[in-house]
Amino acid sequence: MKANAGEVYTVYNQYLKRYTACQVAYIAPPDTVSKESWAVVLSLDWVGDAPLTAEELPHLRPLYKDFMYWSRDLHLLRVPLEVPPQYTLVGTLPPFTDQPCRSYGGWSDGYDVYLQIRWQAAPEKRRRAFKEAMESDGETEIGGIPVKVSNHRVMDQYAPFDSALELKALPCLSELICQRWHPDLLEFLRGNPFISELTLLNHGQRTLDLRGTSIRKLMLDMTGLEELWLCEGTEQLLFQNKGLDACTIHAPEDGSGLTLQFIGEYCPHTELPNLRGLHGIELKDFDLTGLAAVHPHLKELRLWGAPGNLQNFSAVGAFRELTNLSTFDLFGFGADDIPTPEQMPELRWF
């Protein structure tokens, strides 16, 4: 089905686990990027537990993208005219905009809309303070070290704070790198909706509960850690030490939204049967036997060698839901080990 100007579509957003909507604002002519016309798609400010209905069309408004460090603007994207099957046509409205669009891509998977809706859920006072801090030329002190109020990243190695609560002086902080444990770190993280990236090394903890935080990307030293609880929105967990861990990882929906990255060796995490993605780096010898039984719903498998060898590569054929598969600097397999399209019906990128 080809898109037409004014058409409104609804689609399930895998990140929000709810339905969202968009409008084809206009059809753009061919340009230097493509000889084909483009559909310019506008995200709409609507979220629902069920698909959008025609009765709701008159109440729709455009979605403005201004989350985190983005300047406020309509969320527009040039996409191919062919509408993906997961998008359902609801009806037609007069186009909301004819604003020029210079961003290109495929029909959105909804990630930017998810981040915008998540941003709008934060208290308005906090969002306003974030934007003001972004533009500020002022300074404050963290651990006795002068730091710009506009800083979005702090490393305790260079700003050696004792109490993590000192970081409240940085309203647009979004990334924290800790080389040691801070007793009130969890209190600070649970009170800040904008800390999305955390690196935690040499923490000395046996258990770590990050529920109630907003961390999307976690770089974690697994040494000595026995039990880990991830928050609702954690998308990436990157181990920071080589070798096998001995940790039980608790993730929402048994890891359905989580990608895990290990270094060198992997201890199969049977408690994550729904794990979405698995990345391995610095591999010397890695055996794929039995991995699909541990993570049967894996969507992405990416492996990097040191360089190294892969054993039993043909075992990837057991990942029936895999969409993305890649290996780099890894050897030990041949053409006969490559799975057939029938074995991996969902594979889109290899």
Indicate where each model-derived feature is located:
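Intrinsically disordered, low-complexity, charged/polar segments
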Residues: 47-129
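Short beta-strand-centered aromatic/proline hotspots
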Residues: 17-29
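Short, solvent-exposed secondary-structure boundary/capping segments
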Residues: 30-43
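Extended, compositionally biased accessory segments flanking or bridging domains
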Residues: 126-145
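Concave beta-strand-loop units of leucine-rich repeat
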Residues: 140, 146-166, 172-190, 194-288, ...
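Short coil-to-beta transition motif at edge beta-strands of beta-rich domains
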Residues: 1-13
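Non-cytosolic beta-sheet module surface loops
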Residues: 13-15, 331
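Conserved beta-strand residues within beta-sheet cores
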Residues: 18-21, 98, 132
